[in-house]
């Protein structure tokens, strides 16, 4: 039985997450792991968000959180100055830690896309894009429905599953049975979905030329947005970490919200 009064080091959380979604299996451009703070830092209160925005960081400071855990890195591009308004700098000067699981979690078993699959009530049949063949890891998943569905009906299911205000829909094949899914900015996976013979692709941040490719090949595409397809990270992390470390407090930030509204 775990001791609820025992202290917790950031290293313990890091090591657990490294087994869940190995930090070594990520895109070369990415920046994952502990980005602010040290492994020896004591943590008791952990704030979870998609992004370490200024409102999220200020909540962490104001409410006494020790660690901000996010999907997106707080330091992605090199810092050219140390402005106190920069979230990473703000965390550091207030002695807070920040840890990110980005593309390592996107391609992990039970990562973002597997959560997408589960929320739609589907089962994954394979990886859409095996980016890391030695570890058999990659981006996107392929699923087959028990019965065919129309593009509009699938779009409505997607809206409900990912709590989307709106989705963008390109109706290609009208009888959809084989589906590819990928989280976040995933329009580049549409061609992989086409090559796998999928009837539909569900993702986010689809670019204009990617819509045109989909139109030309006749595949249905549903753009559920970057935030809705990845904010699902937060609830999953709270669940697994609370179960593993009951001596700590895990809270989803009230400020982990989409940065824009539809008008």
Put a short name on every predicted segment.
Residues 1-263:
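Active-site catalytic microenvironments in core metabolic enzymes, especially phosphate/sugar-handling
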